[in-house]
Amino acid sequence: DASDTATDVFTYTVSDGMTSDTATLTITITGVNDAPVAVNDTDAVNEDATVTQSSGSSLLMADDTDADDDDSFTVTQIAVTGGSNSAVSSGSSYNSSGTQVTGTYGTLTVGADGTYTYVADQSAADDLDVSDTATDSFTYTISDGDATDTATLIFTVTGVNDAPVADNETGAVNEDATLTVSDGTSDLLHGDTDADGSASLTISAIRTGAEGASGTAGSIGSGLTGTYGTLTVAADGTYTYVADQSAADDLDASDTATDVFTYTVSDG
C-alpha cells in the first residue's frame, strides 16, 4: 500500500586475494498509490421501463479493483459517452443527491457509492419495433482519492409493443343516400398511427355512441344500426353507411344531424 515499506536483503563478500569479509546490502522499497481499475458494465431495460441497481454485484464498482488493499474508491464523474463530465457529489447515492445525465434513450442518475437508476424515455425509443434493441452509452470515473480510472456503462434498450393511436374520422351523406368508403385515403384507418413502423392495423370493434359513452356493440363486417342509418365496417377500415330516410324525415332541406359510432383499432 502507499507508504508501506519492505526490504530486500543481499549478502556480498569482498576479498583482497588473501582474505575476505562479508556484509549485507539492504534495499528499502516504499509503496506508492496504485490506480484503481474500472471495469466496463452493462445493463438492460425495456423502452417503457426503469432499471435500478442499489446493492450487491450490480453496482458500478462491484467489479472494479485496486491493488492497494486498504483503498476504497468512489464514483466521481459521469458523462454520456463522448460528452462532458458531470461531477458526482461525495457521499451521494442514486436517490439522494445523485447526479443526472440524459442519454439518447433515457436518463441515468448515479451516486458516488456506485448505485444508479436508468429511466428509459419511451418517446425517444418509439421507433424501436418489438424486440428491436438500441444502446445508450455512458462513461463513469472512479477515484481512490489519489488516482482515477474510467470505464463505460452501456444499457441495451429493447423495444416493446406501442399502442396504436386512432384518429377521429367524419363522413357526410344525404338522408336518402348511401356513403361507401373503400379507399385508403378516407377509410377509418386513414390517419391512424403506430410508433412500431412494422405494425399492421385493423379495426377490431365497433359500437354506437361517442367515445367514453355507452352504446350498442356491433360486429365487424355486419350492419350496425345507429340513430339515422346502418353502418357496416370491415377490418381493413373500409365502410358503408346507409342512411335511413324514415329516421331522418324530420330534417328540413339543408338541416343536419349526426350519427356517431366508436371504433377500436388494433395492432394485433
Question: Where are these predicted regions, by residue range?
Answer:
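Acidic/polar, solvent-exposed loop/turn segments
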Residues: D1-G268
